[in-house]
Amino acid sequence: MGRVKIKVVKRTALELFKRYPDIWTKDFEKNKKLVQALLKKVSKKFRNQIAGYLVRLVKFKEQNKLPIQYLR
């Protein structure tokens, strides 16, 4: 079982997901590089948490299980 993500990670990932909806994939490594490019000064741990949560959001979107408030 995984750990619960902190609010800052979720909020940042959601903002990136809304701002750039078409660049995210289910590939963690690709998302990690994109996060690093978009957020210049971010720690390794924070970058990885955001990239992981973005993978989760992409999977939810593909399954049409993404809550409506995430798409606004």
From Swiss-Prot:
Annotated GO MF terms: structural constituent of ribosome
GO cellular component assignments: cytosol; ribonucleoprotein complex; ribosome
Pfam family membership, one: Ribosomal_S17e
GO biological processes: translation
Keyword terms of this UniProt record: Ribonucleoprotein, Ribosomal protein
InterPro entries per record: Ribosomal_eS17, Ribosomal_eS17_CS, Ribosomal_eS17_sf
The UniProt record lists the keyword GTP-binding: no
Keyword presence, Secreted: no
Signal peptide: none
Similarity section: Belongs to the eukaryotic ribosomal protein eS17 family.
Protein name: Small ribosomal subunit protein eS17
